[in-house]
Amino acid sequence: MARYTQRPENALKRANEFIEVGKPLRALDTLQEVFRNKRWNYAYSETVIEPLMFKYLYLCVELKKSHIAKEGLFQYRNMFQLVNVNSLENVIRGYLKMAEEHTEAAQAQSSAAVAVLELDDLDNIATPESILMSAVCGEDAQDRSDRTILLPWVKFLWESYCQCLELLRVNTHCEALYHDIARMAFQFCLKYNRKSEFRRLCDKLRKHLEDICKSSNQTTGVSINKVETQQLCLDTRLYLLDSAIQMELWQEAYKAIEDIHGLMALSKKTPVPKTMANYYQKLAMVFSKAGNQLFHAAALLKLFQLTRELKKNLTKDDLQRMAAHVLLATLSIPLPSAHPEFDRFIEADKSPLEKAQKLAVLLGLPQPPTRVSLIREVVRLNVPQLVSEDFRNLYNWLEVDFNPLNLCKRIQSIVDFIENGSENALLTPYIQSLKDVTIMRLIRQISQVYESIQFQRLLQLASFCNIFELEKLLVESVRHNDMQIRIDHQKNSIYFGTDLTESQREYRPDGPALQSMPSEQIRSQLVNMSTVLTRAVSIVYPNRERDQRAKLRTQMVNHYHEIKDREHQRILQRQKIIEDRKEYIEKQNNAREEEEARRQEEESRKAKLAEQKRLEQEQEERERKRHQNEIQAIREKSLKEKVQQISQTAHGKKMLSKLDEEGIKKLDAEQIAKRESEELQREAKELQSKLKSQEKKIDYFERAKRLEEIPLFEKYLAEKQVKDKEFWEATEKTRIENAIAERKDAVGQQERLKRMYPDRDEFLEALKKERASLYVEKLRKFEAALEAERKKRLADRIIRRREERRQAFLREKEEERLRKEEEIRLAQAAEERAAAEARRLEREADDEKRRAQYEKQRAKEEEAERKIKEDRERLARDLASERERTEKERDTWRPRGGDRPSAPAVGSGEWRRAAPTASERNERGGERIERGGDRIERGGERIERGGDRDRDRKDNEGADSSWRVRREPDSQRAAAPKDSNAQQSRDDKWRRGGERDRDFRNDGPRRDRDDGPRRERDDGPRRDRDDERGFRRNDGPRRTEEPQRETGGNWRDAPRNADRENRRPAGERRDRDVRETRGDQRGSAPKEASSGGGGGNWRTAPAAREEKPASKRDQPQEKENKAADDGEWTSVKRR
């Protein structure tokens, strides 16, 4: 169920009622519910919410509920910070005013309570209770009363200030209010002497300033780049500095000075002279309280310069007073110590030099000032001449004149003048410092005149100093290593510079000096001697220096002439660089100014847009509220009208008659509507009961009426059916007649158009005759272009596929080679590891075992040699029998269908088939010439891989084994005969694939490797192109164009298997190997005699050449490389 919420005006009335009956907490809860309800927060204007907020804050102040007040203030800020800032400012100021009034009232109440206690019994002022209380704690009655009565209100007021500052720190529209509240908080701390709260307030403001510097410029955010914001922050920090000085919180004052300096450095606008004068004045005061006389004098000097330059109406008296202040502050600076011992032994986070540099930055100085530099600046500004007559000689007495006997008397007169003059109260703090400086001057001057002096005499000279102060100053001088002093208390004497061998630092006299100390004289004796000798040499040789100068001048002139051009160029280059740099800097400055102008313009544009948006929002909010007020007024008016309207009705009169006048006033529109609805429901029930009785009557009457209507409806429907049938028949008859008439018209139109057919035919024939020749010409050109393009594409496809096959083969070959090399490497590594392990085991075995193993190995080697010899003899016999069988079968293997040609130079392919006709020989001649060289190269290779190895593999492995399973043993290869006949009997079957390799050479796999689509679509164009250029190398007869031979044939004519392996039974392979061996042997003589090889006939065979010995590359090699590629189909020889 939804929670009931009151309207703001009703909540205010109810809160007043709670206040009247003495329940402020209930009243505060009622108002708090309104601010927590989001429904009413933005639905009403400030004229409705502002009185509610004042009442809410009044209750919070009365009940000291600062956290509840904070919640309401934040809600009110969110509602009206963009709509009506003045309302928010009025609420906050009213809240703080109420808190201040209650705090002041509490303070007065506390004072009055103490006064009543004091005046309670005049005869018995010291009561036992007061005596015991004073013994227990050190507080008096006023302090206890303040802690009980005043302190809670002070705490509430402090929390109120903090809440308001936190509330307004990010709103640019309430920026002035924020700084006003900060000043009010400073006044609160001053009034009630709240130093801890003042420190927390300073930290809070410093944190807010850091947040402002870090945050971006939002719609309601505060930007530190604005001049107004910088000025407000600067004024607040100056007020903070004044408050800190009044409360004597010098640490906070120093932090405020740092903040002020940072704001002035951040501001692009030069601060006004009045602000700078106030800044230097406060800074000098802080330095004075910190005991830093050096920077105090520097701050006064900066203030003096600023006032003298910028203040036009400065009177002479004011100038003299300021000059005397600056002069006295400068001369009162303690004499600097050369080597402070704490700087050598104490390690701090920051060295004194870094601290001095930081303080110098606050004064705008490039480096930390010193006493000498300040005195020099004072003299440059002519300050000693600007002071009055009484102070004019002070500078000369302390810094110029050497008169130790009258020094203290002179300074005493000035001290007396300062102490007696009422207008010189500002100079009183410098008296003690001036006395200390005077005593130090006196001691230094006395040390230059006397070697020893009595204490009493020194006290007479230092008239304004006692013995304890004097001894302290003497010890300090020795401690800081400024002077050599020894005090003899027995003789009551003081000795100066007694140790002639000790000189701790180079002495540079500061102030008036008569002579150096004895130790300094001894230390500088060599320097003095060098000076005297130099002077004597100049007297003895007066022209030497002149000659040296002339010689040096000549060298300088020569050197100048040597480097003048280079220096001139360097100077010109430097000038050019400077000019370029100036231009670059100027461009950068212009760009920066343009960027700054753009940024400012963008910021102003954004500010204008934000302001315009705010105004639009305010206008929309006002319109919305006005609209809501109008709606509310209309609702109230309609409520009154509704009451009047209800009173005019019967049930309304009944309902209103039951209520008296007071009851009607207490009811609202909803309750009136509820009463009206109840009255209407009651009347409706009565009416419903009446209607039920009437319904029964009407139902009976309606049923009787419908029973009587049924015969009449049936008669009407029968008549209507007859009429509808007659109407349909008449309509159908009319439609048929219209269709017949339309057909007659269409037939007549067709007959008229038939007479135009001859003319149409004549026109079409004439048009076809005119266009026929042009069509035929275009068709012929198109077919020619189509044929050329088809041939071109077929040729490109043949070349591309051939290159793809070659690349695939080379890639497979390279992969196989790498694999085998890796296997060999692994095998070698395994062998090396096994050999190393064997060697290690052999070293561990004894001599007898090694000898026994040696004998066994010897027996095995003899047995192996015997077996090798037997194998060689057996192989020789097998080879001889194979050679005889080959010679017998050479004449029996003839092509069927004709006799062998008698020409001796026929190609090796003539014996394989019947003698071709002349046309066939001419057709295949070019292809045989191309194949000749390859056949010659392959012939020797096939002969090398002869039948010995094939037969051995068949005997040991069977017909279907491959080269991967077994190879010929090395012993058998070594035992094989070396003659050419034995080598010619070797075949190619040890290669990968066996028969497939030879089929690949003879174009078998070339067809098999092509896919189906190529064989079906591309064979025709490819064969046509091959017919134009002749047979390809190693290409067999074409399938589609080869005529059926009645007799004869060879292995090229046999059908091929689609399998890539293309393997045949072992018997068939043996027969074919025998036939190939015969053919190769038979064609060997012509191959050697012709350069084209065995691919031609007597017409195409070239002339015989002289037989040359086979080159080393063509000679058969004894040993074959087992790791070479076994699947190659090119003519590359094995290494």
From Swiss-Prot:
One GO term (biological process): regulation of translational initiation
Record-level GO cellular component terms: eukaryotic 43S preinitiation complex; eukaryotic 48S preinitiation complex; eukaryotic translation initiation factor 3 complex; eukaryotic translation initiation factor 3 complex, eIF3e; eukaryotic translation initiation factor 3 complex, eIF3m; multi-eIF complex
Record keyword Lipoprotein present: no
An example Gene Ontology molecular-function term: translation initiation factor activity
Region (Disordered): 588-631, 829-1135
Regions of compositional bias (Basic and acidic residues) in chain numbering: 588-623, 829-899, 920-971, 985-1045, 1053-1081, 1104-1125
Residue positions where Phosphoserine is found in the record: 908
Gene3D superfamilies with a match to the protein in the record: 1.25.40.860, UVR domain
Keyword Lipoprotein in record: no
Localization per record: Cytoplasm
Domain PCI as annotated: residue spans: 319-501
Disulphide bridges: none
Subunit relationships: Component of the eukaryotic translation initiation factor 3 (eIF-3) complex. The eIF-3 complex interacts with pix.
Family to which the UniProt record says this protein belongs: Belongs to the eIF-3 subunit A family.
Protein name according to UniProt: Eukaryotic translation initiation factor 3 subunit A
Lineage, highest ranks first: Eukaryota, Metazoa, Ecdysozoa, Arthropoda, Hexapoda
Gene label: eIF3a
